[in-house]
A protein has these predicted regions:
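Residues that form or flank phosphate/diphosphate-binding pockets in enzymes
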Residues: 2, 51, 107
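Active-site pre-lysine segment of PLP-dependent enzymes
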Residues: 28-30, 41, 46-66, 73-104
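Structural motif
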Residues: 32-37, 68, 113-115
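PLP-dependent aminotransferase class I/II
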Residues: 96-176
Length: 177
């Protein structure tokens, strides 16, 4: 919902696309930007198939569109093996990848990141400075160290295993009762 509110503030014309078992269903209408959550679509939980990801990339190239890939909550996909990020297949620089470390670590952390063209990152940093003057650099440095040491990957494996077990127990209980 926060993303939609941001787009509305920019006076964007939002056109929702349907989602099926393979992810976003594209039409031929031109679009300037696509905002997608291919790793774990909210609220359906569907992960976008590899075929549909390729179609989206081709569609964006054909219509000169930009894709904003929000990897929000992809760590909560416990039923499928995750596919690589859409950004990993981006050969044209059309995908802006954004994600957060808050879901898997701590909701209060409020630390996210973006993978995009360096010029866009510079612009985003300038905008962030206008909105949020002094982000907590100590937390950023500690998280960079945590990531560099491989601790985040270890934590994610444990988080995924524990959460998948909880999800399985809840799913079984709901089906039983």
């Amino acid at each position: 919902r926060e993303a939609i509110n941001t787009f509305l503030l920019a006076d964007a014309d939002i056109v929702p696309h349907p989602v099926d078992e393979e992810g976003i269903v594209l039409d031929d209408a031109p679009c300037d930007y696509y905002y997608v959550t291919p790793g774990h679509q909210v609220p359906t939980g569907v992960a976008m198939s590899q075929v549909r990801r390729g179609q989206l990339l081709e569609h964006a190239a054909r219509h000169d569109a930009v894709i904003v890939e929000d990897d929000y909550d992809s760590e909560s996909n416990f039923t499928l093996n995750p596919l690589p990020a859409l950004k990993a297949s981006d050969r044209s620089g059309r995908v802006i990848y954004v994600s957060s470390l808050s879901k898997a670590l701590s909701p209060g952390l409020r630390l996210g990141f973006m993978v995009a063209d360096p010029d866009l990152i510079d612009e985003a940093r300038a905008l962030r400075r206008l909105i949020y003057r002094h982000p907590p650099t100590n937390i950023q440095y500690q998280m960079a160290h945590f990531l560099a040491q491989g601790h985040y990957e270890t934590h994610l494996r444990r988080y995924h295993f524990d959460s998948a077990q909880r999800w399985e127990r809840l799913n079984n209980a709901l089906h039983r009762y």
